[in-house]
C-alpha cells in the first residue's frame, strides 16, 4: 500500500470504479461510476490494472497530488495540462512518479468536461453495496461519500507492474474524440411515436442540434431545443402534462422529457419516474455524456440496436475515435418490440429500453392494481429462474424493466423469452403477498417544503399554477371545497407501495388503496432543482417520499422521517441488518400528524440509529381488494367524476393561460 496526499482537490474530484454499483436499481440506487467510462477504462488498461479499478474522476479541473512513495499514473479524458514537479507530461500513457513528487492536473479549458487520474494498483476505499464509486447526492461510496478535500490521504494498492506485452500508452485510434459538437447513437424507445410523440416530434428530435444547458451534472445532461407538440393532450391519471406516464424504470442514457425539458439521464440519475423517454443512448456511446460541456451541440443518430458497438470493448471496435456516427438505418419500429394479447385477455407491450433493456407493460395506461400484480408475478418468476445475463429487474406501476447483458443474449432473444412466458405464470388475480403496515409521522405543510417552493419561484419559475402553495393547487385540481379536505384525505389514506426508488434511495411510489383517497395532480414543469430529504408529495395519482435531497416534481404535502439508513452497515432500529432501505413492495403506509419541531427531533433520532417506526406484518389479497372495489363502486365512481370535472376545468384554465404553449 502507498499513500497519496491531496495538495489541491480540484473543482470536483471523486473516487469512482467501473461498472459501479450494480444490482440495486430496483431500490433507487444508481450505478454511479465514471461518467466517461471509456477514458477511465483505457487508463486502467494502460497501467495494467483491471479495467474497473478505482480511480479519480475530475470535473472541470484536476487535483494536485503528492506521492510520498512514488508510483505510476495515467491521465486520460478531456485534454488538460498535466505536470510532474512543474514539467509537462503527456496524457494517455504510463508516467512514473518519483517518491515525493507532485502530479498537477490543471483546469480544463475545453473541449470536454472530465479528465481521469488512474493509479497503478488502483485506489483502495471501503465498498458500499459492492462498489467504491462515489454517489455524492447519497453521501456514500468513495472517500467518505464526498468529493476530495485538501489534506485528504488516499491509499493505492501495490503496483503489480505492467502486464507482459501491454502497451505503455493508448493508441491514437483508441482514444475517444472529444470536441464541441457531438453525434450520439440512439435506439428508438421506449416511449416514442405515435402514442406519446407525434411523428413530427420524432423527426425534430432526430434532426435538431440541441445545446447543452449549464445546469447539467452527473444526474443528467439537460438540453435546450424545440418544445414537442405531443400526441396526447395530457397524461390522464399520471398527470396533466402529456409527458406524464405511470411510473416506470428508466435506464442510464435515456432522453427523459421532464415536461417539455429533455434530459439525458446520467450514471447518478434516478431509476424510477413518470416521464416519457423517446430514444435511448446505446451503452457504448454513454461515455460521451461525461464530456458534454455547456454550449456544446448534440445531434441524435438512430441506429439499429443489434448493430451497436459493445460496451465491453474499449479498442478500435468501439469506434470512439470517430466524431461522427455512421448509421444506414434505425430499427423503424417506434421502440415497440412486440404487442400481443395474453392468454387471459391482457394487452402486453414489450418496448425497447436501449440496446440492453426491455420494458414489459401490462394493460391500458391506467392505474390498476391487477396489472401491478401481474408485474409482481413476472418479477418473482424471473428472480427465481436466475437467468444468466439478466442484470437488473425493476418493477414500475404497470411495467417491469429487464436490463441484460447484450453480449449474453440479443434483444430478440430476450423478447422471445419474455413473450414465451405467457400462460406459464401463476394467475395474478389470486395473488396474496406479504404486506406490512408502516406508520410514519408527517409534518403537514412543513417549513422545508415552503423553502423549496420559494427557491423554485426565485430560481426556476414564479408563475407556475402550483405556486405559491402546492396544497391549494391539489385542492383546486381535485374539486375539493377547502384544504382541510386535502389534509383529511392524506391522513385517512392507506398507501400501497408499488415501486421503490422514486426518487432515489428506497423512496416509495405508492397509491391509496381506496380510490376515493386518490388525489390526482400534475408534476412540476420544469422540475424543481432542490427538494428536501424525505419531503412527501403527490404526482399523478401517486405519493412519493423523497429518499434524499435533489430534483423533484411532486406537489408537496409535508415531510416525514428517513426511509434510507445512512448508518449502513451499522445497525438501526426498523431497518433490517445489511438492508439500508426501510420499505418493501406492497407495504401499506399511513401517516400520523406531528409538528415541524417534533419531526426534527424524530429525524435526529433516526439519523442516530435510535428512531423506531411502527411496522406490523400482514398480507394483501388481490381477491379481497377486488371485492372491496365492487362493494363501493357507486361512491368511487362519484368521487372520480368530481375529480374529472375539476381536472378538465384546470386543463382549460391552463390552455387559456398558454401553459401548454409555454417554452421550456
PLM region spans:
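Conserved "landmark" site that anchors the functional core of diverse proteins
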Residues: 1-664
Amino acid at each position: 500500500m502507498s499513500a497519496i496526499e491531496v495538495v489541491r482537490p480540484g473543482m470536483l474530484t471523486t473516487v469512482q470504479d467501473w461498472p459501479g454499483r450494480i444490482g440495486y436499481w430496483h431500490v433507487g440506487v444508481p450505478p454511479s461510476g465514471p461518467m466517461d467510462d471509456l477514458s477511465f477504462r483505457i487508463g486502467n488498461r494502460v497501467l495494467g490494472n483491471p479495467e474497473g479499478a478505482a480511480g479519480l474522476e475530475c470535473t472541470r479541473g484536476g487535483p494536485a497530488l503528492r506521492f510520498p512513495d512514488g508510483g505510476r499514473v495515467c491521465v486520460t479524458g478531456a485534454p488538460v495540462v498535466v505536470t510532474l514537479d512543474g514539467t509537462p507530461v503527456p496524457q494517455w500513457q504510463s508516467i512514473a512518479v518519483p517518491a515525493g513528487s507532485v502530479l498537477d492536473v490543471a483546469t480544463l479549458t475545453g473541449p470536454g468536461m472530465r479528465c481521469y487520474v488512474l493509479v497503478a494498483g488502483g485506489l483502495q476505499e471501503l465498498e458500499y453495496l459492492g462498489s467504491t464509486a462515489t454517489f455524492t447526492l447519497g453521501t456514500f461510496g468513495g472517500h467518505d461519500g464526498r468529493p476530495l478535500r485538501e489534506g485528504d490521504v488516499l491509499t493505492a494498492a501495490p503496483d503489480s507492474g505492467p502486464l507482459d506485452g501491454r502497451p505503455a500508452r493508448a493508441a491514437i485510434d483508441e482514444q475517444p474524440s472529444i470536441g464541441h459538437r457531438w453525434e450520439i447513437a440512439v435506439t428508438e424507445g421506449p416511449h416514442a411515436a405515435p402514442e406519446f410523440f407525434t411523428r413530427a416530434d420524432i423527426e425534430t428530435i432526430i434532426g435538431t442540434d440541441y445545446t447543452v444547458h449549464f445546469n447539467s451534472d452527473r444526474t443528467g445532461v439537460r438540453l435546450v431545443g424545440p418544445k414537442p407538440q405531443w400526441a396526447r393532450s395530457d397524461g390522464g391519471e399520471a398527470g396533466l402534462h402529456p409527458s406524464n406516464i405511470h411510473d416506470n424504470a428508466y435506464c442510464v442514457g435515456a432522453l427523459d422529457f421532464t415536461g417539455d425539458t429533455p434530459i439525458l439521464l446520467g450514471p447518478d440519475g434516478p431509476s424510477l419516474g413518470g416521464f416519457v423517454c423517446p430514444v435511448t443512448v446505446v451503452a457504448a456511446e454513454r461515455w460521451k455524456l461525461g464530456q458534454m460541456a455547456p454550449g456544446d451541440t448534440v445531434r441524435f443518430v438512430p441506429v439499429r440496436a443489434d448493430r451497436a458497438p459493445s460496451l465491453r470493448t474499449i479498442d478500435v471496435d468501439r469506434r470512439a475515435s470517430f466524431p461522427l456516427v455512421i448509421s444506414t438505418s434505425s430499427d423503424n419500429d417506434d421502440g415497440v418490440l412486440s404487442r400481443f394479447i395474453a392468454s387471459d385477455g391482457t394487452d402486453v407491450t414489450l418496448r425497447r429500453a436501449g440496446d440492453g433493456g426491455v420494458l414489459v407493460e401490462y394493460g391500458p395506461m391506467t392505474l390498476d392494481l391487477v396489472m401491478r400484480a401481474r408485474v409482481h408475478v413476472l418479477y418473482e418468476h424471473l428472480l427465481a429462474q436466475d437467468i444468466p445475463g439478466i442484470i437488473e429487474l425493476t418493477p414500475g406501476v404497470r411495467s417491469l424493466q429487464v436490463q441484460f447483458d447484450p453480449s449474453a443474449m440479443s434483444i430478440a432473444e430476450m423478447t422471445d423469452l419474455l413473450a414465451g412466458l405467457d400462460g406459464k405464470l401463476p394467475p395474478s388475480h389470486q395473488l396474496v403477498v406479504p404486506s406490512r403496515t408502516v406508520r410514519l409521522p408527517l409534518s403537514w405543510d412543513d417549513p422545508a417544503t415552503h423553502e423549496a417552493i420559494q427557491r423554485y419561484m426565485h430560481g426556476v419559475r414564479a408563475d407556475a399554477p402550483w405556486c405559491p402553495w402546492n396544497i391549494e393547487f391539489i385542492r383546486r385540481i381535485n374539486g375539493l371545497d377547502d384544504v382541510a379536505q386535502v389534509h383529511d384525505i392524506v391522513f385517512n389514506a392507506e398507501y400501497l407501495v408499488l415501486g421503490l426508488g422514486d426518487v432515489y434511495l428506497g423512496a416509495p411510489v405508492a397509491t391509496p388503496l381506496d380510490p376515493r383517497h386518490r388525489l390526482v395532480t400534475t408534476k412540476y414543469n420544469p422540475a424543481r432543482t432542490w427538494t428536501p430529504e424525505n419531503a412527501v408529495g403527490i404526482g399523478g395519482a401517486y405519493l412519493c417520499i423523497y429518499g434524499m435531497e435533489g430534483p423533484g416534481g411532486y406537489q408537496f404535502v409535508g415531510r416525514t422521517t428517513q426511509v434510507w439508513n445512512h448508518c449502513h452497515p451499522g445497525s438501526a432500529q426498523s431497518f433490517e441488518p445489511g438492508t439500508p432501505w426501510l420499505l418493501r413492495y406492497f407495504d401499506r403506509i399511513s401517516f400520523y400528524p406531528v409538528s415541524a419541531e417534533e419531526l426534527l427531533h424524530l429525524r435526529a433520532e433516526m439519523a442516530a440509529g435510535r428512531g423506531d417506526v411502527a411496522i406490523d406484518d400482514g398480507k394483501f389479497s388481490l381477491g379481497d381488494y377486488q371485492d372491496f372495489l365492487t362493494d363501493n363502486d357507486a361512491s368511487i365512481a362519484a368521487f372520480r367524476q368530481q375529480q374529472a370535472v375539476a381536472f378538465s376545468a384546470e386543463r382549460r384554465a391552463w390552455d387559456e393561460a398558454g401553459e401548454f404553449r409555454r417554452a421550456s
